[in-house]
């Protein structure tokens, strides 16, 4: 079963060291509350026009069949599933690239997805009330997500994750 979710976006207003998981995660808590207030599962955050992460997940973008993600930096907490996505892409033959991703590219993406220990891999089908994707697949989990979701479930069943 493929899962879908709605997200909202916000300016990444957290302190300059989002890569440090510390007891003061108030910025992430406030961002998570924003999504809850809007009936969404996550808040996708942007800093100065560039994708950082979501309030409690890493964010990935599919473009022309490849999976793109922002590289680790002081603005991004590398989630426990961050490196797993690269492994799953290799396993199923999806090109994988870490690079800065502009907000406009996220909004124009073929697919957007989240990863975290609790969400596993989750398709984002709406962002700020706008459907993600293009054509007949608009607003639905896409083919890159479907392949990664299946690979994730296989790895989980084999207890390799």
Question: Predicted regions: what is each one?
Answer:
Residues 1-161:
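Helix-start/capping segments and mature chain N-termini
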């Amino acid at each position: 079963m493929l899962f879908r979710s709605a997200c909202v976006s916000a300016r990444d207003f957290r302190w300059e060291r989002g890569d440090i998981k510390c007891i003061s995660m108030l910025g992430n808590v406030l961002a998570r509350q924003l999504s809850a207030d809007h009936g969404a599962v996550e808040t996708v955050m942007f800093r100065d026009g560039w994708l950082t992460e979501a309030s409690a997940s890493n964010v990935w973008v599919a473009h022309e069949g490849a999976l793109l993600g922002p590289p680790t930096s002081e603005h991004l907490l590398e989630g426990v599933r961050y490196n797993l996505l690269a492994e799953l892409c290799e396993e199923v033959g999806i090109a994988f690239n870490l690079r800065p991703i502009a907000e406009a590219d996220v909004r124009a993406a073929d697919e957007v997805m989240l990863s975290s220990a609790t969400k596993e891999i989750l398709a984002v089908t709406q962002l700020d009330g706008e459907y993600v994707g293009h054509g007949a697949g608009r607003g639905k989990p896409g083919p890159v997500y479907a392949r990664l979701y299946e690979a994730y479930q296989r790895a989980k069943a084999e207890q390799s994750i």
